[in-house]
């Protein structure tokens, strides 16, 4: 049962519980209200807000687009979606330079992949790709 008041969904909550929100995660851990695989739907309608911080990058591209479409379906008119995700452009600019030797490039590539996979990231977004995906979802 959601808390009283407007429906607000916190997707990928983990241990970062938000009071007054429905805290959702794929794992049953303390503070999670609803355990679900959001790639199969959110299970709610008419939400005022959806918050997903450092979540989208953990989905494969097709699943992420489906999630964004589901957010559009679930949000009531005037509702809002707030997300944060690592910016691929920043990762590229800060970790990979074209004017360095091959060994430095190889080490940068290893560091990026270690960080990318070590945090179980599936797909990194830049602003342009995320904007295009959001616009295509409505």
Task: Walk through the language-model features, giving the residues of each.
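S-adenosyl-L-methionine-dependent methyltransferase catalytic module, highlighting the catalytic core
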Residues: 61-76, 80-138
């Amino acid at each position: 049962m959601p808390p009283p008041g407007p429906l607000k969904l916190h997707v990928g909550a983990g241990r970062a519980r938000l009071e007054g929100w429905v805290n959702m995660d794929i794992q049953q851990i303390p503070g999670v209200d609803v355990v679900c695989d959001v790639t199969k739907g959110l299970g709610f309608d008419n939400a005022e807000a959806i918050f997903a911080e450092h979540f989208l990058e953990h989905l494969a591209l097709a699943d992420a687009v489906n999630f964004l479409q589901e957010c559009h379906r679930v949000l009531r008119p005037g509702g809002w979606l707030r997300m944060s995700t690592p910016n691929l452009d920043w990762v590229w600019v800060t970790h990979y330079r074209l004017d360095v030797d091959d060994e430095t490039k190889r080490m940068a590539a290893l560091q990026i992949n270690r960080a990318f996979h070590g945090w179980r990231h599936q797909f990194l977004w830049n602003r342009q790709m995320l904007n295009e995906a959001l616009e295509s979802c409505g």
